[in-house]
Curated annotation (Swiss-Prot):
Any one Gene Ontology cellular component term annotated for this protein: nucleus
Name assigned to this protein: Ethylene-responsive transcription factor RAP2-10
Example of a GO biological process term: positive regulation of leaf senescence
Gene behind this protein: RAP2-10
InterPro entries in UniProt: AP2/ERF_dom (IPR001471), AP2/ERF_dom_sf (IPR036955), DNA-bd_dom_sf (IPR016177)
Disordered: annotated span: 132-153
Pfam families membership: AP2
Functional description taken from the UniProt entry: Probably acts as a transcriptional activator. Binds to the GCC-box pathogenesis-related promoter element. May be involved in the regulation of gene expression by stress factors and by components of stress signal transduction pathways.
PROSITE patterns for the chain: AP2_ERF
UniProt record similarity statement: Belongs to the AP2/ERF transcription factor family. ERF subfamily.
Length: 196
């Protein structure tokens, strides 16, 4: 016969496990990232065959940190890497760069990997920040910047690439779908101040 304590232990164990999993998902929703006490998300990755880590940066959103991690792990391990967002790098190959690359047979430098990962993370953070007050939607969309096409499947925001006039919002200047950082300490030109 079971005692009340044994029954309580059996019943509470799954609830504790579910709560622990939920807490872990909230604190670390993606591989290779963690949240600082003050709310910033950071990404880092261990170098292959070494004890040292490559610092990938600090980001406002977990998605930006996870995308930076994905970029770094893809450069280090190639197409066989376990990614947070594998659909974003499907069919992509690494060419050129820091020291030969995954396909070139050489090792990439940690600085090159850090730089590439930080670029991707910063782009995702900028898209998230630019869209925070704008047009939200939950669809996959494709952007074109110059000669580079990329698919942004995990952004909840849309940038209107057909926008012909420049508009300024939350410290960013948006012209023809591209974002520029506006210096908020600089006084506007008298000629163009009415246009913004």
């Amino acid at each position: 016969m079971e005692t009340a304590t044994e029954v309580a232990t059996v019943v509470s164990t799954p609830a504790v496990t579910v709560a622990a999993v939920a807490t872990r998902k909230r604190d670390k929703p993606y591989k290779g990232i963690r949240m600082r006490k003050w709310g910033k998300w950071v990404a880092e990755i261990r170098e292959p065959n070494k004890r040292s880590r490559i610092w990938l940066g600090s980001y406002s959103t977990p998605e930006a940190a996870a995308r930076a991690y994905d970029t770094a792990v893809f450069y280090l391990r190639g197409p066989s890497a376990r990614l947070n967002f594998p659909e974003l790098l499907a069919g992509v190959t690494v060419t050129g760069g820091g020291g030969g690359g995954v396909n070139g047979g050489g090792d990439m430098s940690a600085a090159y990997i850090r730089r590439k990962a930080a670029e991707v993370g910063a782009q995702v953070d900028a898209l998230e920040a630019a869209g925070a007050g704008g047009n939200r939607h939950h669809h996959h969309h494709q952007h074109q910047r110059g000669n580079h096409d990329y698919v942004d499947n995990h952004s909840d925001y849309r940038i209107n690439d057909d926008l012909m006039e420049c508009s300024s919002k939350e410290g960013f200047k948006r012209c023809n779908g591209s974002l520029e950082r506006v210096d908020l300490n600089k006084l506007p030109d008298p000629e163009t101040s009415d246009d913004d």
